[in-house]
Regions:
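Walker A/P-loop NTP-binding motif
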Residues: 19-28, 108-123, 143-149
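Conserved nucleic-acid-binding Ia/Ib motif block in the N-terminal RecA-like helicase ATPase lobe
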Residues: 124-192, 200-203, 246-250, 258-261
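Conserved pre-motif I regulatory segment
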Residues: 1-41, 80-98
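Conserved SF1/SF2 helicase motif Ia
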Residues: 90-103, 116-141, 152-156, 229-231
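Methionine-biased hydrophobic packing positions in alpha-helices, especially
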Residues: 103-105, 115, 191, 212-215, ...
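Residue-level signature of catalytic and energy-coupling elements of molecular machines
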Residues: 3, 15, 99, 115, ...
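Post-DEXD/H (motif II) to motif III coupling segment of the RecA-like Helicase ATP-binding lobe
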Residues: 197-206, 210-262
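Acidic, glycine-centered low-complexity repeats within long intrinsically disordered regions
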Residues: 48, 52-59, 65, 72, ...
């Protein structure tokens, strides 16, 4: 598939389902996907992100595709979206996404690669927030995103979580970063200290949302979502669709599309 040509020799079902949908999503104003009107245009950002896309493999292998081929790869992703997923062209226009997928299905790449394409690396304000239930997952996501974006000059990812000194995290945030990966409690603390500034956030990802709710982060999640700009995209990943997930979807997601991966 075209996703395989991005460097994923064995893309997982959640990657095949989510990546094409996000790349088609019109709420990504800066998505670097060729269209009938601009297919001949290339931008510096497209070149950088295309090189990055070809560098990633499911096994963490080195670059397997030449950078000059990657614009063609992105175009093929666009063309192959219908065959790569069961999502219709109409449903691809939905703004927000709920993806029901188990842990260990490659979710970070599924949302990480498309989200990275929407970031302006010249702007040091926070543009993406990713919430995770544990310190370990928070660090894993941050490490993966740093790996994916290693060819994007000026892009900074900061992980913030409890159980360690907050001072170092405050210093990192004050330097500016485009992506914050956080546990809900620590992010709330940094918001109250007016260190985490979320007024420019365009994408919010809730990874393992059901686990965060089970751990008692309901109020924190509500406060974080309520503090974000109205114009944003929300991506919610969960293993189950329980009552609290449905409540969050009804309260904070707009015209969302539900993707179910696996049984």
């Amino acid at each position: 598939t075209a996703i395989s040509e991005m460097g994923y020799e064995n893309p997982t079902p959640v990657q095949e389902a989510v990546i094409p949908v996000l790349l088609h999503n019109p709420s990504f104003p800066n998505t670097l996907i060729p269209t009938a009107n601009d297919s001949e245009d290339t931008s510096e950002e497209a070149s950088v992100m295309s090189e990055e896309a070809s560098a990633i493999s499911a096994e963490g292998a080195d670059i397997t595709e030449a950078a000059e081929e990657s614009n063609e790869v992105i175009a093929e992703i666009t063309a192959d979206a219908d065959s790569a997923t069961e999502v219709s062209a109409e449903s691809q226009r939905h703004r927000d996404i709920i993806a029901l997928a188990q842990t260990g299905t490659g979710k970070t790449a599924a949302y990480g690669l498309p989200v990275l394409q929407n970031i302006n690396p010249k702007d040091r304000t926070t543009q993406v927030v990713i919430l995770s239930p544990t310190r370990e997952l928070c660090l894993q996501i941050a490490d993966d995103l740093k790996d994916y974006s290693r060819y994007i000059d000026g892009l900074h990812v900061v992980a913030v979580y409890g159980g360690t000194s907050i001072e170092g995290q405050i210093r990192q945030l004050k330097k500016g970063c485009q992506i914050i990966v956080a546990t809900p409690g620590r992010l709330i603390d940094l918001m109250h200290r007016k260190v985490a500034q979320l007024h420019s956030v365009r994408n919010i990802v809730l990874d393992e949302a059901d686990e965060m709710l089970n751990m008692g982060f309901t109020d924190s999640i509500d406060e974080i979502l309520a503090a974000l700009p109205e114009e944003r995209q929300t991506l919610l990943f969960s293993a189950t669709m329980g009552p609290e997930i449905e409540r969050i979807a009804k309260s904070y997601l707009k015209d969302y599309q539900e993707i179910v991966v696996g049984s």
